[in-house]
């Protein structure tokens, strides 16, 4: 089987070329061709010797996930569905803003964490994505979006907030991050690359040490009782441990704050009392809040908080001195909004039926 060079960061690519008896600078050349020029085969790499191109064609390949579908929302949001084999697809979403272009990338096919308000979690878990499948999302989007009239990349920011829990696919995510940050890859700043986690504490500590990019934490609750209910991972790493891990992460983080994401669920976590509990919870963690109006999906069992509840919640946090944003709903018409990245995942665990039975039982 040929080696897919898209799975390698510069360090791995350099080792690969050394094993072939080639000089280290060849790795930099090939990396630039793959990620900066969007080359899909070695014959395009005209500054490589013909003999090396022949050798690479025999031993290696550049295998990018196949594009299954591309959609564009009325608000400019773009979504690509990529084929990762065996009938599975993963989604990546581009969100344009006036001052930046953000790409939201998936790290797994499905998700095993079972956050109760997340449509991806309801699909069950299939497998981790390879580094090539993760970076391939940026490759496709970069090719589609191109550069601005000033010759700047349209994609200026990357957030690992798509399907899956990035920390549960740690090694492949770190390899992909390394390619994103490398000047021979995409040359992104650590400050402009964000990994989101539901709170896998040991992996947060590892990421701080090996690849400290910006960090977002899917918090969604102000106390353990509510978080245990909606983010089951909290039973393993409760809020006290999570807050301590956030403090440790900031020692090496490229930004001096953590972003806490908080989905607003009507009657569950959106009361003034919850906002006041939050203030107490994060008092020792420099942070910003991103409030996310819930995006309803079939059989979710949840409703979006009212605009009034969101406003009151935001005001309480702001009056306590926190920077708070309320996420605008983007890409609703192409199911690209936060929590809707269900993809074309086969529901191997039949969790949809399980949730329907639970809801029927609650209504009876």
Swiss-Prot record:
InterPro entries: Aldolase_TIM (IPR013785), Methyltransferase_A (IPR040072), RlmN_N (IPR048641), RNA_MTrfase_RlmN (IPR027492), rRNA_lsu_MTrfase_RlmN/Cfr (IPR004383), rSAM (IPR007197)
GO CC field: cytoplasm
Catalytic residues of the enzyme: 91, 338
Cystines in this chain: 104-338
Pfam family, one: Radical_SAM
GO MF: 4 iron, 4 sulfur cluster binding; metal ion binding; rRNA (adenine(2503)-C2-)-methyltransferase activity; rRNA binding; tRNA (adenine(37)-C2)-methyltransferase activity; tRNA binding
EC number: 2.1.1.192
Highest taxon of source: Bacteria
Cofactor binding description: Binds 1 [4Fe-4S] cluster. The cluster is coordinated with 3 cysteines and an exchangeable S-adenosyl-L-methionine.
Keyword Ligase: no
Catalysed reactions, as listed in the record: adenosine(2503) in 23S rRNA + 2 reduced [2Fe-2S]-[ferredoxin] + 2 S-adenosyl-L-methionine = 2-methyladenosine(2503) in 23S rRNA + 5'-deoxyadenosine + L-methionine + 2 oxidized [2Fe-2S]-[ferredoxin] + S-adenosyl-L-homocysteine; adenosine(37) in tRNA + 2 reduced [2Fe-2S]-[ferredoxin] + 2 S-adenosyl-L-methionine = 2-methyladenosine(37) in tRNA + 5'-deoxyadenosine + L-methionine + 2 oxidized [2Fe-2S]-[ferredoxin] + S-adenosyl-L-homocysteine
Leftover remarks: Reaction proceeds by a ping-pong mechanism involving intermediate methylation of a conserved cysteine residue.
Name of protein: Dual-specificity RNA methyltransferase RlmN
Organism of derivation: Neisseria meningitidis serogroup C / serotype 2a (strain ATCC 700532 / DSM 15464 / FAM18)
Lineage: Bacteria, Pseudomonadati, Pseudomonadota, Betaproteobacteria, Neisseriales
